[in-house]
Amino acid sequence: MKLSMTLSLFAATAMGQTMCSQYDSASSPPYSVNQNLWGEYQGTGSQCVYVDKLSSSGASWHTKWTWSGGEGTVKSYSNSGLTFDKKLVSDVSSIPTSVTWSQDDTNVQADVSYDLFTAANADHATSSGDYELMIWLARYGSVQPIGKQIATATVGGKSWEVWYGTSTQAGAEQKTYSFVAGSPINSWSGDIKDFFNYLTQNQGFPASSQHLITLQFGTEPFTGGPATFTVDNWTASVN
């Protein structure tokens, strides 16, 4: 749920790159692959990210992880991210995305999710926001989003649990809405703007004053493993 502060930036020709340090990152605009072990000190274990293909047309990568201890805490959010021009959510016409992924060990505590941040200030740090939108394509074990379930909604032709909760990030309150699939969705193409439209119409999300500042897709491991999470291909754009 937290975005890495990039400490290492590898060349765009990062195919085959292995990243094991806390905030390693590889980039080929507009895409990046990020290690992001932001919660590693809350448990014991290891994790590395392997870039399979990274270009201007998409990202393919996998991560191998094993974590124990710190039950109920996220250890990392290894992800692929998109660089885009920040704009008000109300001015975004569409956010098309497509992903195919797999998880070899499902006897773990983890989720597979999109993570987006918005903020009134377009220059807000991209590691948090006034609002966070998460789309859980899978959850394994007993993990739950922050807060509690407040509704069930059909968005993009699929049924989702809708959760809401708050947390303190960088000294300020962050409001998090999570849409959770009832069973794993290993291949998905959709428009994330549909989720913002739902929140605007049903939960009072202030789309006309919030800028979209971050868009990522990855996995949050809590405990378990060894496990391998593989992204065969991920694409996204903000229009």
Swiss-Prot record:
Residues 1-16 form the signal peptide. This is Endoglucanase A. It comes from Aspergillus kawachii (strain NBRC 4308). Keywords: Carbohydrate metabolism, Cellulose degradation, Glycosidase, Hydrolase, Polysaccharide degradation, Signal. Has carboxylmethylcellulase activity. One of its GO terms (biological process) is cellulose catabolic process. Pfam families: Glyco_hydro_12. Belongs to the glycosyl hydrolase 12 (cellulase H) family. GO terms for molecular function: cellulase activity. It catalyses: Endohydrolysis of (1->4)-beta-D-glucosidic linkages in cellulose, lichenin and cereal beta-D-glucans. Gene3D superfamilies: 2.60.120.180. The lineage of its organism: Eukaryota, Fungi, Dikarya, Ascomycota, Pezizomycotina. It is an enzyme of class 3 (hydrolase). The gene is cekA. InterPro entries: ConA-like_dom_sf, GH11/12, GH12. Its EC number is 3.2.1.4.
